[in-house]
Design a protein with these regions (language model features):
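Thiotemplate assembly-line natural product biosynthesis machinery
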Residues: 1-22, 74-77
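Phosphopantetheine carrier-protein modules
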Residues: 14-33, 49-61
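Two-component histidine kinase catalytic core, primarily the HATPase_c
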Residues: 38
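C-terminal structural segments of small proteins and small subunits
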Residues: 53-77
Length: 77
């Protein structure tokens, strides 16, 4: 199993959004200013990095990097 940390997810989100600091509970849209296309790019980067597939229905439940980490941890084996 691949070890995935919140720091890994925060760095990925920060890189995709072009921001310096991201915390686990920052809301992607409200706090970090992400738009739907940005979230789609974040999901695509996560899928590529961790070799997973995120369903459209799952995307609707991702509000923070912590939510994203929880989803990735469930899918990575």
């Amino acid at each position: 199993m691949t070890d995935i940390s919140i720091e890994d997810i925060n760095e990925l989100v920060a890189s995709q959004l072009g921001v310096r600091v991201v915390t686990a509970h920052d809301r992607l849209m409200e706090d970090l200013g992400a738009e739907f296309a940005d979230v789609a790019n974040i999901i695509a980067a996560v899928e590529e990095k961790y070799h997973i597939v995120v369903k459209e229905s799952e995307i609707a439940r991702i509000f923070t990097p912590a939510d994203l980490l929880q989803l990735v941890e469930k899918k990575v084996v």
